[in-house]
């Protein structure tokens, strides 16, 4: 848990449980997880994210939230594996600079956007929207400036390539 002190940059982090792997997390809890947050580099050629989180995802219950700040299209694999679970994307406006081997500085916008990864999911858009709004409200109570996006792909593209089109053109498939 990260708690922000209003009006300051002071953070308080409380860690309730530390586990060595996902299976240990699954066995350490007697009830299903409401959210699974993936903050990893998506390397689908190296490993399958769906395989890794399978033991902590409860069908029709767990919301899978993927930090897609620097990626595109990684949610599809999760939606195919967990068709009855809402998969949301999270895009952060913050920049991260490594100052030393274990020292990092956050700068830039603190805005966070969440929204359904794919609107053509098997899950109704109203349910995806409700989950997005519930998560945004939860994060807002912790003083995180979180907004619900109706088009999360827009935030992903803006974050990855910037707001202008002066850079070279590229083609992507998702």
What would you call each of these model-derived segments?
Residues 11-105:
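Rossmann-like NAD(P)(H) cofactor-binding subdomain of soluble oxidoreductases
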Residues 1-13:
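Glycine-rich phosphate-binding loop and adjoining beta1-alpha1-beta2 segment
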Residues 2-5, 22, 51-57, 79, ...:
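Flavin (primarily FAD) cofactor-binding/catalytic cores of flavoenzymes
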Residues 84, 101-174:
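Internal alpha-helical scaffold of NAD(P)-dependent oxidoreductase catalytic cores
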């Amino acid at each position: 848990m990260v708690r922000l002190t209003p009006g300051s940059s002071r953070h308080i982090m409380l860690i309730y449980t530390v586990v060595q792997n996902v299976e240990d997390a699954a066995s350490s809890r007697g009830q299903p997880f409401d959210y699974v947050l993936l903050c990893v580099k998506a390397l689908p050629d190296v490993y399958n994210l769906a395989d890794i989180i399978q033991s902590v995802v409860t069908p029709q219950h767990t919301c899978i939230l993927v930090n897609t700040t620097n990626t595109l299209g990684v949610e599809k694999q999760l939606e195919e594996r967990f068709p009855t679970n809402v998969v949301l994307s999270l895009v952060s406006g913050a920049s991260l600079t490594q100052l030393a081997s274990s020292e990092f500085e956050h700068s830039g916008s603190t805005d966070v956007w969440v929204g359904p990864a794919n609107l053509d999911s098997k899950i109704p858009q109203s349910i995806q929207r409700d989950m997005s709004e519930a998560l945004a409200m939860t994060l807002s109570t912790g003083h995180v400036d979180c907004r619900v996006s109706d088009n999360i792909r827009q935030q992903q593209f803006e974050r990855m390539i910037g707001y202008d089109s002066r850079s070279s053109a590229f083609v992507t498939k998702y």
